[in-house]
Amino acid sequence: METEKIIRLSVRNLVEFILKEGDIDNRISGTLDKDAMLMGGRLHRKIQRMMGSNYQAEVSLKLQLPCDGFQLKLEGRADGILLESEKTIIDEIKGVVRSLDRVEHPVPVHLAQAKCYAYIYARQQGLKQISVQMTYCNLDTEDVKRFREEYTFEELEKWFLDLVHQYERWAKLQIEWEKRRDASIHQTEFPFAYREGQFDLAASVYRTIYHKKKLFIQASTGTGKTMAVLYPAVKAIGEGLGDKLFYLTAKTITRTVAEQAFSILEEKGLAFRSITLTAKEKICFCEETECNPDACPYAKGHFDRVNDAVYDMLEKQKKLTRESIERQAEDFHVCPFELSLDLSEWADGVICDYNYVFDPTAHLKRFFADNVSGDYLFLIDEAHNLVERGREMYSASIYKEDILEVKKLMKDRDKKLVKSLESVNKLMLEMKRECENYRLVESVSPFAVKLMNLLTQMERYLEEERNAGNAEQPDAFMELFFQVRQFLEIHELLDENYIQYTELEGNGRFKIKLFCVNPAENLNHYLKLGNSTIFFSATLLPIDYYKQLLSVEKDDYAVYAESKFPQGNRKILIGSEASTKYTQRGTEMYRKIADYLRSTVDGKNGNYIAFFPSYQFMEDVLEEFEKRSSGVELVIQSQFMSENQREEFLEMFEEERDHPMLGFCVMGGVFSEGIDLTHDRLIGVIVVGTGIPQVCNEREIVKNYFDQRGMRGFDYAYLYPGMNKVLQSAGRVIRTEDDKGIILLLDDRFQNRQYQHLFPREWKEYEVCGWKEIKEKMEEFWENQ
């Protein structure tokens, strides 16, 4: 007998999905987000404590309900349950900035959520009657207004089952799709002949998912890692080991690789709904991204129409491409970005940026709010990027100058707001006087308290302005508003992984920063909501460093997948006479590096790229190279290139060329990672320098943090991030088994064991030479090809 499908859903998602209506209006929703408005739960907890000993706070509730052809498993958390003499009351707490006099009745979705909790609790406890209490609290005055309604169990059951019945048609549609999907997964074979080692890699991924573990994969170019990770993950979904995979990337170009892999599998017969989430600013139909019904016609009535748009796409089994989503949004007159988010709930695979999962201010609440776990598989591509991205996502700063600017803007507009800004500014001024360069601070809690008051005043001001018809506010005000909100959210996360400090920057600006040095704990908060995680990259070296900063588990798996490309196709040279140390920099060294470059490109006509540690260093060497560049075509990366300019730059790398062309680029920039110049489009890479970041306060904080914990602080702060840039830059050449090319490392430090210890295994054969030997070495290599 076939086991009935179990569909898991949070109570919040159920009511918001079925009962949503009206307009998109970020002037309301953007400022009335529950977590932000309750300032990390401070006021929430205060109200709960005031309710006495008969009040149970944060009660988890679950219900598995038999439906037509499936089981619905609902999960949620009631803010409180109050036992009052013979009455049972479900309490739902919401924060508001408006005057409580204007809150005349509960918001329908809020009430529906509480009624669901009431039904579940009454059903489980065998209650004939139960009350629902909506508690609204003004964040400025902390005044409270309550609405209480009593229901019989029969009333709640009738209402609840009707709600579930409205959901059933969606569930049935999904179940039918999953049957088709799983049947196709079972018959879909690996789309290529397995390369050497590729089957073992795919098997490692499947085993990891089966055991619900994490896996770190160092997979050099040529191992076919994308398909070796994606295919077993899809297979695992077909075996019920997961119900949705998230393919997470740091850059747009990597998303394209994932899309191509899905397309290849679909050509082999796979039925699998995959969707790529495009940033709101890119997919928006309007010139300005203003999400409210006054500025955007697609926002007006969006929620009245969007479910029909989603159901139509799913029922007709339309492909969830950006183009089809934009067409559907036009046809149904809805926001394309919000439509894509709704469709992602019904997709089997979601390709998106890291921040949709990990960023506390931008993650997809429909999947990751309320701490409700799901059978998710996380595939994290180019995972070496997640350390710095994690630090950025879980850190926050406030600048004194921004506070002062907004204070001046508000001077004649709102006295209470100005007073709050003045209070924050005064405290920052005191802290600034104690700071010469940067200063570690034991606690910024007094500052956070003042920011809480400021946020409340800003919320109140925005609400009053909106009610008066003044929706538009100065950019500086709104930017500070979001910065304050983020700072307070991050403040709630503070633990031993953080350093709090103040800094007087070189330009005179003063900031207070909450710096997440080790993001592993915060990342794990989201990863544990899924079943399994695969971290993979061509430059995940040393793996122990990444395991330390990306995971909190001690028993994670790790695999090193070596490239099986012929060793003879690659020539690795280390320039013994070059150095990028600050003490060695100057005209003489720039000339020497220019000589190395010239000798390299003279070895064979074709396309080369030289990667430099900074734009300034690149320009200094370029000035010398131009004196000896006769017959060499130059193409140069500039700062702040547009998408079109980047494409034009890459188009210069044609396969056929009867003279040398040399690109001047910067390590860590857009051309040092993710670009795929195969065959003769690129035959050589010169990496100038070790990639070590410049010494700065934040790097020193990282160094000292790990030194104090008995770990190699210099390596964590400087060496490992620098060598990652080197490996990424060098990885631009030799992308397929037929490619042939050279890698020249220009810095005498590459001869040191400290650096060679971080070379991938494929680099075990290299030669050290001076610039006068380079041309001969090049010619010898190319003659043997």
Annotate each PLM feature.
Residues M1-E86:
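Metal-dependent nuclease catalytic cores that hydrolyze phosphodiester bonds in DNA/RNA
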Residues Y210-P232:
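Walker A/P-loop
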Residues E176-Q218:
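Conserved pre-motif I regulatory segment
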